[in-house]
Amino acid sequence: MHINASAIEKVVLFGDSLMAGYGLPKEHHLSSVLENNLKQAGFNIQVINGSVSGSTSSGGLNRAEWSLSDPGIDLIILGMGANDMLRGIQPDETKKNLEQIIKIAKVKKIQIILAGMIAPTTHGAKYKKDFDAIYPKLSKKHNLQFIPFLLEGVALNPSLNQQDGIHPNQQGTIKISENIQKSITVSYTHLRAHETAYY
């Protein structure tokens, strides 16, 4: 799919409290940290916080059309499913909702980086197996740039999480930003290649 852009200029973080900056001042929200880090690396990219604390994949789907309505959006980081998992929502339902969000973004010619989640064994081994498989299956089916686990290097590390043990603190947010930035750089290069080939 051709993307008519010379570079990524606007990124939307489309997720839940794990990307929304829950419990942190605005300057330490993931959107702020990621935008600053990208600028320091030479990328003039605006990062929009389109995440909503408490959002399930169903809630994300309900707001996807208007949240992604800005024609200037080049890329979304899709990171939802944690609240589905906490509520025991069936993985098939989560997968269906995420796939619909992916399709909405594709129709709008928005690039997608899919950030995966990993379930604990709270709801049983079968639930964990089915849930964990959602993200690699969707990334393969739709040929998406893929971050296997959004909280890689952060989850279960007390020094990188707030007192609730769930939401990243300032240092944890920096780590997540680094993980996402690597994938954005790949997507940036991909868009540049598309533009060069087109012209």
Predicted regions and their residues:
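Structural recognition of the beta-strand scaffold that forms the well-ordered cores
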Residues: 12-13, 47-49, 75-79, 113-116, ...
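Short, amphipathic alpha-helical "lid/cap" segments that border enzyme active or binding sites
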Residues: 61, 95, 170-181
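Conserved small/polar residues in nucleotide/adenosyl-binding loops
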Residues: 189-196
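Extracellular serine-dependent O-acyl
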Residues: 113-118, 129-159, 174-188
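Catalytic-core regions of hydrolytic enzymes
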Residues: 51-73, 85-102
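Serine-esterase "nucleophile elbow" of acetyl-processing enzymes
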Residues: 3-53, 63-72
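Active-site segments of SGNH/GDSL-like serine hydrolases
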Residues: 79, 99-133, 152
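Solvent-exposed loop/turn segments at secondary-structure junctions
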Residues: 18-20, 52-57, 82-87, 118-122, ...
